[in-house]
């Protein structure tokens, strides 16, 4: 199995705002994709995201939601390489910033798709950072 791990520091951002950016429709559409259906943050809820030129949606079931500190998703729909992977977000306060750690685990191997996803998450985290630090909505995938 192959796993990826990222960390980003968000200056002047509190953990509640970082959590909201990861768990609400308004938050996710502010930095990730403009097409997201986010019914809620209860365990069992399914987030559905669409991306340009993708023939399917990415469906993430909420497996854990600890306000302002941790979110876990299980990918139950999407490209074959994503299904069955887990996306885990840890959020903590560090002085005047929030620190967000992203772990995406359970990939079958380190192949080209894995490498592409690794770079993609780095780009998404920079979009998240810009959204939270400036308040300007600019989803990476906007259509």
Q: What residue spans do the PLM features occupy?
A:
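Structured surface interface patches that mediate subunit assembly and partner/cofactor docking
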Residues: 27-38, 118, 123, 134-143
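Beta-strand/loop substructures that line and gate deep hydrophobic ligand-binding cavities in soluble
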Residues: 78-123, 128-130, 139-140
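Glycine-rich portal/gate segments that line the openings of hydrophobic small-molecule binding cavities
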Residues: 30, 36-77
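Hydrophobic pocket/interface hotspot
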Residues: 18-19, 28, 47-49, 62, ...
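Intrinsic-disorder/low-complexity, polar/charged segments enriched in Ser/Thr/Lys/Arg/Asp/Glu/Gln
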Residues: 3-7, 46, 57, 70, ...
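Hydrophobic/aromatic beta-strand elements that line small-molecule binding cavities or substrate pockets
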Residues: 7-9, 58-64, 85-93
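Hydrophobic ligand-binding cavity/cleft-lining segments
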Residues: 1-38
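A short, structured loop/turn motif at beta-sheet edges
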Residues: 13-16, 63-69, 90-99
